[in-house]
């Protein structure tokens, strides 16, 4: 690594306003030759107030700074320490700009010669990490971080992760290091200096048989699964007893009973629906049932989960735990479709591609690292988003396989017979083509969180044209001879002329003209759609931030679609009879677009349900034209019901009014399902209450002021009495932000952190909410599911409105034709299920203390209140005004205080 010294800096500040806020803590960790050689830390005094959010986040209070120096008192010392170092920080723009500004106020010009952003570094070095927040990285790489958001600890943790990244780079093959170095010249910061030193000082390593080479790529060699040697003569009960004893788990007869039910369905190739409440230990039950089934029959079992998170938990935590205590090994593997796995030929093509913008350069570097680590070749391990995902999707779509290509799917297929348990998720299960996957090896399937299955099917019923996607796909071909695929075609034509290649002449000029006309025709199509939006009734989906048009004439759209399809046909004809791989890539790209437009045109002609969505009413680029081509029931019947001989649907909320009929209605075939409703282990308790205020102003969507004011009054009352955290759920962002504005003005809540849901930030917000003792989280009803509410003492959820979907919701529109009564058969069961899921997340254990406050009195006063009653069987139900609410809170608080004393 040479003799460079790295100063890894972390700052805590009063906020993120560069011209106003100030530093309150600085931590610096010095690294040389992959060793921590020194540290510096100081609290920094400020005359500004430290906001409650910052105090909660950093645990730095104003009293802690009274004896600390002002920055100008230590500025020169800090400057002398770091002026000759490589300046390093995690998300460097924040720390570097703040410290520059602080130095500037002290008449010190700080201009580090080299800077490095560890956010950029870690994305490359750790390409499969799901989050690049420092706390998540520390947890992922087993580096202790006891006090996140304290500058000294954050700086040291960042330094240790940086060392780990450097050591990882140093172990790479020289060819990989060189490629990383050349690509790093396209990055924003100075990583290329470090990589240059690595290449320059490379020490030859002994041959490593774990790696092989394909063209310029060094990749990890796949190790075939060994056929499992299973030696177990006992019963399922014996297996369960062994596992619970070995893992020091509570022996639960109910959990064993659940496992026995599942095994019985598997053994008899039956189809079953099981409602097993949250906290009943479903995962262990079905894993042991699947294992016992494999022991007795040798047959494989597929398990489908709701999310990638649950999928990862099974593969990375639950099954390895079982393997640690069993006398035999369970071979489990992720099962996906062929298109989810990448080939080395495709990676090679990506690396050779001329596109070298920042995002693509990061992607190429990630691929070089990832391919030395992956055992699966599953491209989704990289968690690609945005431009990177679009780029890779396009490369996959237009890839023409090379000779002797190595495809990771073939490895999965080769080892399929030795897989005992296959793990997938609902999206893959529903999307999979049984003829192009190894799904056909599985006759038996257990579907966990089965109540979510229809939602994933709903995502598969439409085809769409997306303005940005079409423009991007055309852009990948290029507009002139110096861009993208057109450049490659022009180069091929020049080679044909100069080297007299034995291929037909290529009309490059005609191709260029046609591509530019296709750009114009695409603009015309989406201008037509945009004009339709301007003259139509537009409905808002406030939760997902989309606007929809459902009722419109399609004549002009069909006319524009036909013009594009005709032009694509003429363009494709240019390449008739040509087989060169460059031509194949362009042709494949054009055919992809042709098929996309043709499918939409035919669906509209066939009078399929069509609609328009737009993210921003002022931006044509956010338009999508969608057509419903399938029924959800058809998809679920074909992709799930008919695919497996044995099916076990399991969920904590599979019944509606104690009946499985609502879920059974999602399938076309009249199947005689075995049904099991396992009672909850939780019993009625003084610590589980639901309160419905009777003094709240009637909800009026045109004037929410009074309704919102009532919600705020109850929040303040709760906080004042309990001093506990609170989750408040809304069905619209508008109401949520109105409540937020009022709460921020209240002096009673000065020491509380008010958190609000933001798109794509749920994980981060939940982490903050769970970490802060005094916090209020305002979110939408999407938080009903999958939210692990952590709190000491009382857990409180306030519900502004019951989670009914609006009749203008896109789901309502898509499902309207599939039910006799959309409200009774779809909307009401959906609302009850979501409500039950929310309660289940709140109360998971016998000693949990929970309070639900529903401002929506439909919970107890509507004609359909009985359908919600099942959710409230273990809650004490109360109605009253805010004084009675205060009385209830004091009763609960006294009970909790007495318990803590005893």
Curated annotation (Swiss-Prot):
Keywords: ATP-binding, Exonuclease, Hydrolase, Nuclease, Nucleotide-binding
SUPFAM superfamilies per UniProt: P-loop containing nucleoside triphosphate hydrolases, Ribonuclease H-like
Locus of motif DEAH box: 448-451
Protein name: 3'-5' exonuclease DinG
Gene it is expressed from: dinG
A GO biological-process term: DNA replication proofreading
Domain of life (superkingdom): Bacteria
Classification via InterPro entries: ATP-dep_Helicase_C, DinG, DnaQ, Exonuclease_RNaseT/DNA_pol3, Helic_SF1/SF2_ATP-bd_DinG/Rad3, P-loop_NTPase, RNaseH-like_sf, RNaseH_sf
This protein's GO CC annotations: cytosol
Pfam families per the UniProt record, alphabetical: Helicase_C_2 (PF13307), RNase_T (PF00929)
Enzyme Commission identifier(s): 3.1.-.-
Domain Helicase C-terminal: 714-883
Family per similarity comment: Belongs to the helicase family. DinG subfamily. Type 2 sub-subfamily.
Lineage: Bacteria, Bacillati, Bacillota, Bacilli, Bacillales
Enzyme type, top EC level: hydrolase
Membrane keyword on record: no
Binding site for ATP: 276-283
Every Helicase ATP-binding domain range: 241-496
């Amino acid at each position: 690594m040479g003799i460079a010294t790295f100063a890894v800096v972390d700052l805590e500040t009063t906020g993120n306003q560069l011209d106003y806020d100030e530093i309150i803590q600085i931590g610096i960790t010095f690294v040389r030759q992959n060793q921590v050689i020194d540290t510096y830390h100081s609290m920094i005094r400020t005359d500004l107030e430290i906001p409650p959010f910052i105090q909660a986040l950093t645990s730095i209070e104003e009293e802690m700074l009274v004896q600390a120096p002002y920055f100008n008192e230590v500025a020169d010392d800090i400057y002398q320490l770091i002026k000759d170092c490589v300046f390093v920080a995690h998300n460097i723009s924040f720390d570097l700009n703040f410290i520059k500004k602080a130095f500037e106020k002290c008449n010190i010009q700080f201009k580090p010669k080299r800077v490095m952003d560890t956010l950029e570094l870690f994305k490359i070095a750790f390409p499969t990490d799901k989050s690049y927040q420092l706390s998540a990285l520390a947890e992922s790489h087993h580096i202790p971080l006891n006090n996140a958001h304290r500058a000294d600890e954050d700086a040291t943790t960042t330094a240790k992760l940086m060392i780990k990244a450097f050591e990882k780079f140093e172990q790479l093959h020289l060819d990989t290091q060189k490629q990383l170095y050349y690509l790093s010249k396209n990055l924003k910061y100075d990583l290329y200096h470090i990589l240059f030193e690595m290449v320059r000082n490379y020490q030859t390593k002994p041959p490593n048989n774990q790696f092989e080479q394909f063209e310029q790529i060094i990749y990890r060699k796949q190790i075939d699964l060994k056929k499992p040697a299973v030696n177990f003569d006992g019963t399922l009960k014996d297996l369960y007893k062994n596992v619970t004893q070995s893992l020091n788990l509570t022996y639960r007869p109910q959990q064993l009973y659940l496992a026995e039910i599942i095994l019985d369905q598997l053994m008899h190739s039956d189809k079953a629906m099981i409602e097993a409440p949250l906290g009943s230990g479903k995962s262990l039950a079905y894993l042991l049932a699947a294992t016992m089934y494999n022991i007795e029959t040798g047959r494989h079992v597929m398990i489908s989960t709701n999310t990638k998170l649950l999928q990862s938990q099974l593969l990375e935590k639950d099954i390895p735990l079982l393997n640690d205590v069993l006398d035999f090994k369970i071979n489990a593997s992720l099962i996906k479709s062929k298109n989810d796995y990448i080939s080395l030929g495709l990676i090679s093509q990506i690396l050779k591609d001329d596109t070298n913008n920042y995002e693509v350069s990061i992607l190429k570097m990630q691929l070089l690292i990832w391919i030395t680590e992956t055992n699966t070749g599953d491209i989704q391990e990289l968690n690609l988003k945005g431009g990177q995902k679009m780029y890779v999707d396009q490369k996959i779509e237009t890839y023409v396989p090379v000779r002797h290509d190595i495809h990771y799917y073939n490895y999965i297929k080769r080892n399929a017979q030795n897989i005992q348990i296959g793990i997938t998720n609902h999206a893959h299960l529903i999307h999979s083509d049984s003829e192009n996957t190894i799904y056909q090896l599985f006759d038996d399937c257990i579907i966990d969180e089965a109540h979510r299955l229809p939602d994933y099917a709903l995502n598969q019923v439409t085809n769409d044209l997306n303005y940005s996607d079409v423009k991007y796909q055309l852009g990948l071909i290029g507009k002139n001879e110096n861009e993208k695929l057109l450049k490659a075609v022009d180069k091929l034509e020049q080679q044909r002329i100069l080297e007299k290649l034995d291929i037909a002449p290529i009309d490059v000029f005609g191709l260029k003209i046609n591509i530019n006309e296709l750009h114009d025709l695409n603009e015309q199509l989406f201008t037509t759609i945009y004009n339709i939006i301007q003259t139509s009734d537009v409905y808002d989906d406030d939760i997902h931030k989309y606007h929809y048009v459902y009722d419109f004439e399609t004549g002009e759209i069909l006319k524009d679609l036909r013009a594009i399809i005709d032009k694509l046909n003429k363009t494709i004809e240019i390449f008739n009879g040509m087989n060169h791989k460059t031509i194949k890539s362009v042709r494949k790209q054009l055919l992809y677009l042709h098929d996309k437009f043709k499918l939409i045109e035919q669906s509209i002609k066939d009078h399929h349900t069509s609609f328009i969505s737009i993210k921003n009413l002022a931006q044509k680029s956010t338009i999508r034209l969608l057509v419903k081509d399938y029924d959800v029931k058809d998809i679920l019947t074909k992709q799930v019901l008919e695919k497996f001989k044995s099916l076990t649907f399991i969920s904590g909320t599979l019944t509606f009014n104690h009946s499985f009929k609502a879920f059974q209605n999602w399938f076309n075939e009249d199947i005689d399902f075995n049904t099991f409703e396992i009672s909850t282990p939780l019993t009625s308790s003084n610590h589980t209450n639901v309160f419905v205020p009777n003094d709240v102003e009637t909800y009026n969507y045109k004037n929410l002021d009074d309704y919102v004011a009532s919600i705020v009054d109850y929040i303040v009352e709760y906080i004042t009495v309990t001093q506990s955290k609170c989750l408040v759920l809304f069905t619209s962002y508008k109401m949520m932000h109105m409540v937020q504005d009022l709460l921020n003005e209240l002096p009673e809540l000065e020491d509380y952190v008010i958190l609000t849901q933001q798109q794509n930030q749920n994980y981060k917000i939940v982490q903050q909410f769970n970490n802060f003792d005094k916090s209020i989280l305002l979110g939408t009803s999407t938080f009903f599911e999958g939210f692990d509410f952590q709190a000491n003492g009382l857990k409180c959820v306030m519900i502004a409105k019951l989670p009914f979907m609006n009749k203008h919701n896109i789901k309502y529109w898509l499902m309207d034709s599939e039910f006799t009564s959309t409200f009774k058969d779809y909307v009401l069961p959906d609302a009850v299920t979501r409500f039950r899921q929310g309660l289940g997340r709140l109360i998971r254990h016998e000693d949990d203390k929970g309070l639900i406050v529903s401002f929506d009195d439909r919970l107890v006063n509507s004609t359909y209140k009985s359908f919600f009653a099942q959710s409230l069987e273990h809650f004490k139900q109360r109605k009253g005004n805010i004084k009675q609410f205060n009385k209830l809170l004091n009763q609960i608080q006294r009970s909790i205080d007495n318990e803590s004393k005893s």
